[in-house]
Amino acid sequence: MKKILVIGDLIADYYLWGKSERLSPEAPVPVLEVKKESKNLGGAANVANNLTSLKAKVFLCGVVGDDLEGKHFISTLKTRGIDTSGVLIDKTRCTTLKTRIIAQNQQIVRVDKEIKDPLNADLRKNLLDFIAEKIQEIDGVILSDYNKGVLDFELTQTIITLANKHHKLILCDPKGKDYSKYSHASLITPNRAELEQALHLKLDSHANLSKALQILQETYHIAMPLVTLSEQGIAFLEKGELVNCPTIAKEVYDVTGAGDTVIASLTLSLLESKSLKEACEFANAAAAVVVGKMGSALASLEEIALILNQTHPKILPLEKLLETLERNQQKIVFTNGCFDILHKGHASYLQKAKALGDILVVGLNSDNSIKRLKGDKRPIVSEKDRAFLLASLSCVDYVVVFGEDTPIKLIQALKPDILVKGADYLNKEVIGSELAKETRLIEFEEGYSTSAIIEKIKRTHND
């Protein structure tokens, strides 16, 4: 599990949902009949919440006011499993609160309550002391700047310098016109309008996009410059050349918090040793999930996997798979594995499993799961490609990706008629066997294994 330190402006997002069908007799304004209220984590806290949804360990650093909103905010963070030891209380300010009023699923007005004053000397010292204490423990840092007073120029540069000194990845979601504030960061994530404003350059052509990113790289020493382009995806530089990672088409309901989702998913992907292109693809998929929901929504790993793997109808998230299986009464067979470098032994095993029932469901370990189980050099083949290859086999009916170390949650949900494992589990505990009607062990075809294939490639390469 990656450990990420998120620093920035903490915002409470408050939503009033209802319907508006008449005007007030007091003034020509609509009257909202409130049907529902909700309070969400916003700003840097939404970044932290997104990371938690993606199974990261998060330490959050920022300030709230000494008020009811601040107390509720900290309580919500703790409920989400976010470490709040770096959340400081500022008695001189209110907790930043954005109230959105929504009628018939359309936002009609937003009311902001905030104080943007810089932090006082004591709070700055306490904040920096916390960061210095955590910097060696964490894997990466995110600065989420909403221009609410926490991340001024001096503090931002101090944090970036500290992160670089300890060789930590540091990403910044920028605000304002002066990007020297973020110089020497690993990556920044401005949108088109923000970058145009900062550089006084219209990003209306391939040439200008490339020029803008080169300025970020050469003038501000940003190692991985990129710009988010809404429906046009994400553009970045790779070896001096402009690369566009297209967005994933999906109906847009609400873009609130999409930028937070992008920087959270980019950070996690890069920390998992993904290339910048792979990280952008992952971020685009995560953004596609959240813009399809109302409010500061979250994307789960399962939802992102569905978006990334939607090229094959057999690849489903667990919720969708359960809905599909409810419609039939056939005998369900379940097995699971990494299936890294799919080979004849795998295919033979799956054919035998399918012969035991009507529907064969394969639980597939995610990339992160495999790294935890087998080390950082695995998997060889990405989960997207492994899922597609499995789904392409006629004996496999459905593939569901899981991010845990074991498939117990899948088995609990599916309650298969037959649970299948390899014969190497003879006299060993088969996880979830008590939840299936029957457990069967199948012999593997001799002479086939991923490890053997890898060793053969190594020998051939060395020869």
UniProtKB/Swiss-Prot annotation:
SUPFAM superfamilies: Nucleotidylyl transferase, Ribokinase-like. Residues 1-315 are annotated as: Ribokinase. It comes from the Bacteria. GO terms for biological process: ADP-L-glycero-beta-D-manno-heptose biosynthetic process; lipopolysaccharide core region biosynthetic process. The keyword Transferase applies. ATP binds at residues 191-194. GO terms for molecular function: ATP binding; heptose 7-phosphate kinase activity; heptose-1-phosphate adenylyltransferase activity; phosphotransferase activity, alcohol group as acceptor. The active site is at residue 260. This is Bifunctional protein HldE. It comes from Helicobacter pylori (strain J99 / ATCC 700824) (Campylobacter pylori J99).
